[in-house]
Design a protein with these regions (language model features):
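Long, charged N-terminal accessory/stalk domains
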Residues: 1-354, 389-396
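Conserved, carboxylate-rich catalytic/transport cores that coordinate ions
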Residues: 2-8, 19-22, 26-33, 295-648
């Protein structure tokens, strides 16, 4: 269980076999090809082709998003189609035809969207016109030779008599008012008055907050509403035709998916081609291959092609890609590490050690046997069954093992869906059954669980520091390993011995802890300022280094979340059981209990599982990896068939 050892591959071949060599390497999928360009040799001009493939791929992806889902539902549970016997290359005719289909799908969807936008605009216009439906004069008419016409709406429901009084009070009694429509929300008005009353009437209209509609047009309102209805019917027919065409084109989904993968494979090949060194007759390729595959790869290349292959160990400082090689228990958590950072060539593989703590801490925070069994069943089926692609199963395998740990800690804490066994026994039976804790009841003894959590945190931190000490020692800096890490380990162990001796009443252990911690602290004072030239600054730097103990204490206290989340899971689960039992015994009470339990425990499961996942990751990233893990490496990404729908 370690990082995969890599071999550097250098290959020189003939240009006439270049295409075949690249396709052979792509079919094997075991070589991470590096950029081999240099000033002394030329390169292939592939930028235009790559850009064209990118455009085709983008177009096909947009078309697939538009089409209805695949018959198998797609999504996480869709497996790649085995394309054995199907060529992964396509001629220009096939590409042109398939991209044309994608373009038709996009065009139809665009036209449909434009019509949908038009419908929205028609709805707005109809809403504006509807209050004036019964208006029998052109709405655009605003003035005659001696009169002024105002058209608009005011808030609330009003009568012509009420409004006439408003105008009369405003000095514009010589006015004609027609209420076109009235609802509780608004009243639509048509107002006519002599032009010599413009100022007075305008003031009243302003006071009433008369809002004039915009863009009513020259035709009558009834004619405009009729045209809107006719246009809406026409759009419905056009959308129906478009939907039929899109449904017919849905039969091309398989062809589009196949072409998408074909173009992706071809684009990847052109990207690799752009990084090769090329002369008039030959090409040069470099990369990295796992050591266990190197000889087999070299023999295969030499047998099939006329070329030269050289394998060598990478030199110090090379950008060697990293890959993990772990067993079935450890490999599921590799994604946790790669999400943080891939290891550099200087790092060790942290996964074997991290996996132990990861499963342990997750279970301690989720800590319910019922929830753990649910996780084991669900994630076990998805992780070890044949429902998903192999690369999709890894996360579910990780949560399966987390479920095992959760079940273990649930038994230790006496929690099975909280206190469901005791609640069911008490509500529907004689109250004689209960799951007793094997180790400790966190509700009754939270302090004991807190001490245990902090103790596990100390072990976690010391493990990280021990790894750092080992790596420094391995690199030949033995003095630094002892002074920079060893002394701190001794300080922590001494403090732990002091605390343990005081708690247990053991003066010998407490005194030993004092001596160890004090001696290690003196060692830190004498060595942590060794990079300074001034003796006073050396001493001051050493004394100042002791302030780092506050950071270590903060790290240790952060493990209190192991107690807090574990306690929260059990307490909330028990509260849900209490709520469910309020219906009492009998059939009705049982139905109420089941309904509340299913809903409540599902919610509690989701929330606390997410919390356990997030905080377990945090403990690894912040408290553990920062003690020794440098990262900064590059993930091994072999040149191969990176497809979405088909396996070539």
């Amino acid at each position: 269980m370690a990082l995969v050892k890599m071999k550097r591959l250098e290959l020189v071949g003939l240009n006439r076999e270049r295409k075949q060599v690249l396709e052979y390497l792509q079919s094997l999928g075991c070589v991470d090809i590096s950029d081999s360009r240099c000033e002394e040799v030329g390169t292939a001009q592939t930028a235009a082709a790559i850009s064209r493939f990118d455009a085709y791929i983008s177009q096909i992806m947009r078309a697939l998003e538009i089409l209805p889902p695949a018959a198998d539902g797609g999504g996480m549970f869709r497996r790649k189609t085995n394309a054995a016997g199907v060529a992964y290359t396509a001629d220009e005719g096939e590409i042109s035809r398939t991209v044309g289909i994608a373009a038709d799908i996009i065009r139809l969807a665009k036209e449909k969207k434009e019509r949908t936008d038009e419908l929205s605009a028609l709805d707005v216009r109809e809403k504006t016109l509807e209050p004036f439906r019964s208006l029998d004069v052109p709405p655009a008419l605003r003035k005659t030779r001696r009169t002024v016409i105002r058209l608009g709406t005011i808030e609330g429901e009003h009568t012509a008599e009420e409004l006439f009084g408003e105008f009369a009070d405003g000095g514009a009694a010589d006015v004609y008012i027609e209420v076109i429509s009235a609802t509780k929300q608004q009243t639509a008005l048509w107002i006519l008055y002599p032009d010599y009353l413009e100022n007075e009437a305008a003031a009243v209209c302003t006071r009433l907050n008369l809002l004039a509609p915009k863009g009513l047009g020259a035709e009558s309102v009834a004619e405009q509403l009729g045209k809107i209805a006719a246009r809406r019917e026409e759009i419905a027919r056009q959308n129906s035709d478009t939907n039929e065409k899109l449904s017919a084109l849905a039969a091309e989904r398989g062809a589009l998916e196949l072409m998408l993968d074909r173009l992706s494979v071809r684009r990847d090949k052109y990207r690799v081609l752009s990084g090769l060194g090329i002369t008039k007759t030959a090409f040069f390729l470099t990369g990295y291959v796992p050591e266990e595959l190197a000889d087999k790869l070299s023999d295969g290349l030499m047998q099939k092609f006329t070329l030269s292959v050289q394998l060598s160990d990478p030199e110090e400082g090379e950008d060697v890609p990293s890959a993990f090689d772990n067993n079935a228990l450890v490999s599921p958590v590799e994604g946790i590490t790669s999400d943080y950072a891939m290891p550099s060539p200087h790092d060790i593989d942290p996964n074997p050690i991290m996996a132990i703590f990861y499963y342990f801490f997750f279970g301690m925070m989720f800590s319910d046997a019922g929830y753990g069994i649910v996780m084991m069943i669900g994630c076990g089926l998805l992780g070890f069954g044949n429902f998903l692609e192999p690369e999709k199963r890894r996360t579910f395998k990780m949560f399966f093992y987390c479920g095992v740990s959760t079940t273990f800690w649930g038994i230790m804490y006496g929690s099975f869906f909280g206190d469901m066994i005791a609640t069911v026994s008490r509500t529907f039976g004689k109250g004689q059954l209960a799951l007793l804790p094997v180790l400790v009841d966190p509700v009754q003894k939270p302090l004991s669980v807190l001490i245990m959590s902090v103790a596990f945190g100390v072990v976690h931190i010391l493990t990280g520091m021990a790894i750092k000490m080992y790596m420094t020692w391995r690199d030949g800096n033995r003095f630094a390993a002892i002074c920079d890490t060893g002394f701190w380990i001794a300080v922590i162990l001494g403090i732990c011995a002091l605390a343990g001796g005081s708690a247990l009443g053991s003066a010998v252990l407490a005194n030993a802890g004092k001596i160890i911690a004090a001696a290690a602290a003196i060692g830190l004072v004498l060595t942590q300022g060794r990079d300074k030239k001034n003796p006073v600054m050396k001493l001051f730097g050493g004394i100042l280094s002791l302030y780092d103990i506050t950071s270590i204490v903060g790290d240790v206290l952060s493990y209190s979340r192991l107690m807090a989340l574990g306690l929260a899971t059990g307490v909330i689960a028990s509260v849900i059981n209490v709520l469910g039992s309020l219906g009492g015994g009998g059939i009705f009470g049982f139905i109420v209990f089941v309904a509340i339990s299913v809903f409540g425990h599902s919610l509690n499961f989701a929330i606390n599982m997410l919390g356990a996942y997030v905080h377990t990751n945090r403990l690894q990233y912040v408290e553990f990896y920062q003690k020794f893990y440098e990262g900064g490496g590059r993930k091994f990404s072999p040149f191969g068939f990176k497809t979405k729908y088909y396996k070539f």
